[in-house]
């Protein structure tokens, strides 16, 4: 592992440990705080960083990087440009002080989409790997689907309640599907009682009743649904961004809330031509 170093305390500890072990030129990566105020050296720290690095041989800087605060929104473009300018200046100062070239990177997924002139030596594709645009732009295709199957369909007479605490009642004779996914799997309880939908055979069907720990109920009265049919929680027909919008949160939270007990199935795709790659990312 090659650690990021964001403070003098950590830098000194790395130097001390490499000296103790007799290690030389161990690669580290210098983080600069250009406005996020989460972790990082301040721009004015660069001369001292250079001095300490040049006085020892245990560690060597391989890259310098920073993190954008609001690259996903045009309302923060002035601040983003300020961050980019600061990083460009600081990276050049660090290279001049160390007298060798560093790998430079600052763009996250939204930055890759919106600030192409600053791709530098590397970019950091995060949520874009899931086919989700952090800035709401077109071009990325969904690559992940959360799905389950219908366990049972019950015929429920008008006036009966569905689920815990009797929070939902059917106003007509209804067909209710039970699916094995609940809040312990990452399906947020705020989607209960019509707050969310699923897709069954191409049709959107509302969640009815309170979402349980391991299951929830779906109103399929108006859908040609059968036991064993596939149920899409999110995917191509129901984007994860739509779920996050309903919860007034971000897609990251939806995706990272899926619990470890949910089975993951991975597919690989070998691309042999540039045309195939363009087709995958939606380039006309």
Report each predicted region and the residues it spans.
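Active-site-proximal beta-alpha core segment in soluble small-molecule metabolic enzymes
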Residues: 1-103, 119
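Active-site anion/phosphate-binding pocket segments in diverse small-molecule metabolic enzymes
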Residues: 7-13, 78-274
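N-terminal non-cleavable signal-anchor helices
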Residues: 24, 60, 266, 282-284
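Short, glycine/acidic-enriched loop or turn micro-motifs at the edges of active sites
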Residues: 34-36, 70, 111, 213, ...
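Conserved protein kinase catalytic core
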Residues: 37-39, 73, 114, 132, ...
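Single conserved hydrophobic/aromatic residue that forms the stacking wall/gate
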Residues: 272-284
């Amino acid at each position: 592992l090659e650690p990021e170093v964001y403070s003098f305390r950590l830098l000194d500890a790395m130097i001390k440990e490499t000296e103790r072990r007799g290690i030389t030129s161990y690669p580290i990566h210098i983080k600069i705080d250009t406005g996020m105020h989460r972790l990082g050296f301040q721009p004015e720290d660069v001369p001292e960083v250079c001095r300490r690095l040049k006085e020892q041989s245990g560690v060597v800087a391989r890259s310098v990087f920073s993190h954008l605060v609001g690259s996903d929104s045009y309302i923060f473009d002035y601040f983003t440009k300020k961050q980019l300018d600061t990083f460009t200046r600081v990276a050049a100062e660090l290279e001049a002080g160390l007298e060798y070239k560093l790998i430079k990177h600052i763009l996250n997924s939204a930055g890759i989409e919106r600030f192409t002139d600053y791709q530098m030596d590397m970019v950091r594709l995060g949520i874009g790997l899931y086919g989700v645009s952090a800035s709401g732009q077109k071009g990325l295709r969904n690559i992940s689907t959360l799905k389950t199957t219908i366990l049972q369909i019950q015929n429920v007479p008008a006036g009966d309640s569905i689920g815990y605490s009797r929070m939902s009642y059917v106003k007509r004779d209804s067909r209710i599907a039970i699916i094995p996914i609940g809040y312990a799997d990452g399906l947020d309880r705020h989607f209960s009682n019509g707050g969310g939908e699923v897709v069954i055979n191409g049709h959107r069907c509302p969640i009815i009743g309170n979402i349980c720990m391991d299951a929830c109920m779906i109103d399929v009265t108006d859908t040609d649904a059968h036991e064993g049919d596939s149920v899409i929680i999110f995917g191509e027909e129901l984007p994860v961004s739509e779920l996050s919008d309903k919860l007034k949160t971000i897609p990251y939270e939806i995706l990272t809330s899926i619990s470890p007990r949910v089975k993951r199935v991975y597919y690989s795709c070998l691309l042999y031509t540039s045309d195939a790659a363009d087709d995958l990312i939606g380039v006309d």
